[in-house]
């Protein structure tokens, strides 16, 4: 039986903290502010509160405000000049190439964003599967239901 390796995306395969997350957070604040008709400051506090409580801002927005997750992700993660924002980890391609077995991305990020990051980082073809927030029906990790679905889908024991 081959070993299965599970990788997160943001801040694992690339540095999202320094350039991408600040931009995504700003876009989330703007979207939440507009959608709920609240100040940017209140939107920022709500975004962080949902992140702390649910592991993903989107989960709180769906639960408490019936937000459309597809619209929200499109508005907050469709970044222009993306190439300049992505900083892959040093020796990423070489390191991943040394890992033998099935490799799967498991991320709370949206599909289009994830695929773009992997392609810009030149490691897209190195992964056998990509499991994104859409695949988990917008239930973020580390939620047990999301993990159970992920493990079953890829027959991981």
Go through the PLM ranges and name each one.
Residues 91-100:
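Catalytic-core regions built around general acid/base machinery
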Residues 84, 104, 110-157:
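Substrate-recognition "cap/lid" segment bordering the active-site pocket of phosphatases
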Residues 1-2, 100, 157:
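A general structural motif
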Residues 2-7, 12-90, 112:
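N-terminal helical cap/lid subdomain that shapes the substrate entry/recognition surface
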